[in-house]
């Protein structure tokens, strides 16, 4: 399954908008910033004060499996951080499938990143 950066932007913005409704713009922005893993490619994702995410590059490029893993790690950390403020935050996101890409790439098993990697490895 091939995803483009623009697919990630759409999914991340859905998650950001949902979080913004619960946590407010300031906390959502801080959560995105504080949970971003130290991976240079992720620095291309910019978040403005209204918590809209953009990408400073070619959004029609395909995303590699390695890049998807970094996005998954970031999303997992972001949701776990939000769960410290809102009870059942991760459960609500999972049940409503907020920001999910086709095949559940971003949010399926958000509470267990290692399970996600294991399942994807078995499928290959």
Whereabouts are the PLM-identified features?
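Long, compositionally biased intrinsically disordered regulatory segments in eukaryotic proteins
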Residues: 1-124
């Amino acid at each position: 399954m091939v995803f483009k950066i623009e697919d990630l932007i759409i999914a991340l913005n859905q998650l950001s908008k949902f979080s913004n409704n619960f946590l407010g713009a300031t906390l959502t922005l801080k959560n995105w910033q504080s949970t971003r893993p130290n991976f240079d490619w992720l620095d291309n994702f910019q978040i403005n004060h209204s918590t809209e995410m953009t990408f400073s590059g070619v959004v029609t490029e395909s995303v590699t499996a390695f890049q998807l893993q970094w996005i998954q790690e970031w999303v997992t950390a972001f949701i776990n951080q939000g769960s410290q403020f809102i009870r059942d935050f991760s459960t609500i996101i999972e049940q409503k499938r907020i920001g999910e890409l086709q095949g559940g790439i971003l949010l399926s098993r958000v509470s267990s990143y290692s399970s996600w990697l294991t399942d994807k490895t078995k499928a290959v």
